[in-house]
């Protein structure tokens, strides 16, 4: 007869498996570590997750995470409103900000096109992006999606649609490696890719 772990522990393992890159064994190791060695850390993690889910929302303008209706970047009068940079995730936005080479505004897709996974234009908030880019203020849209197959397909789809509306559309230069995700690329490489962006 095999021994089953307590249901509370099994639920914790299952919840941890929802995290990207965490499989069953990793989830089990994390759960046991938290319960054996870091209960205080586990409680802090639980409180932080609850606080984040209760207080974080999407910015009404750019779709990134914020605690207010409109994020700090969108409220910043020093930003250039004629430039709109499209990224896949808030983590990509933060990486671009760390380069200190871009002073425009953003739109965060919260994903990328992936028909096999059921992610189409609606899931990446395409209509909101088009409305934002077509506000009469934006002059250039910088496509900073990742250089993965899905990121390239997303950039192509967005580029074709936005160019048809008379907008100048540029793409980050290839300083970012093929298959590379912005979140994992150093700030210097991203800065060079932003400065050397090309017209689509």
Swiss-Prot record:
From which organism does this entry originate?
Burkholderia thailandensis (strain ATCC 700388 / DSM 13276 / CCUG 48851 / CIP 106301 / E264)
What residue stretch is flagged as signal peptide? none
Residue intervals of every C4-type zinc finger in the record: 59-74
Which Gene Ontology BP annotations are present?
Answer: DNA recombination; DNA repair
A molecular function annotated in GO for this UniProt entry is: zinc ion binding
Q: What is this protein called?
A: Recombination protein RecR
Listed InterPro entries: DNA_Rcmb_RecR (IPR000093), Rcmb_RecR (IPR023627), Rcmb_RecR_Znf (IPR015967), TOPRIM_dom (IPR006171), TOPRIM_RecR (IPR034137)
Q: Which residues form the Toprim domain?
A: 82-177
Organism placement in taxonomy: Bacteria, Pseudomonadati, Pseudomonadota, Betaproteobacteria, Burkholderiales
Asked if RNA-binding is a keyword of the record, the answer is no
Which keywords does this Swiss-Prot/TrEMBL entry list?
DNA damage, DNA recombination, DNA repair, Metal-binding, Zinc, Zinc-finger
Q: Does the keyword Zinc-finger apply?
A: yes
| Stated family | Belongs to the RecR family.
- Provide the function of this protein: May play a role in DNA repair. It seems to be involved in an RecBC-independent recombinational process of DNA repair. It may act with RecF and RecO.
| UniProt superkingdom | Bacteria
């Amino acid at each position: 007869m095999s021994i089953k772990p307590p249901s509370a522990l099994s639920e914790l393992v299952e919840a941890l498996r929802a995290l990207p890159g965490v499989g069953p064994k990793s989830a089990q190791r994390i759960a046991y570590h938290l319960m054996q060695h870091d209960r205080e850390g586990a409680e802090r993690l639980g409180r932080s997750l609850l606080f984040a889910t209760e207080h974080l929302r999407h910015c009404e303008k750019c779709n990134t995470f914020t605690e207010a209706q409109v994020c700090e970047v969108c409220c910043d009068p020093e930003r250039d409103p004629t430039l709109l940079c499209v990224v896949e995730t808030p983590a990509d936005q933060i990486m671009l900000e760390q380069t200190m080479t871009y002073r425009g505004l953003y739109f965060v897709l919260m994903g990328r096109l992936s028909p096999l996974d059921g992610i189409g234009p609606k899931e990446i908030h395409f209509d909101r992006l088009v409305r934002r880019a077509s506000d009469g203020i934006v002059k250039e849209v910088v496509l900073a999606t990742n250089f993965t197959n899905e990121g390239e397909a997303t950039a192509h789809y967005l580029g074709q649609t936005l160019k048809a509306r008379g907008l100048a559309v540029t793409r980050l230069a290839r300083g970012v490696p093929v298959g590379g995700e912005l979140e994992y690329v150093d700030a210097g490489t991203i800065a060079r890719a932003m400065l050397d962006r090309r017209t689509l």
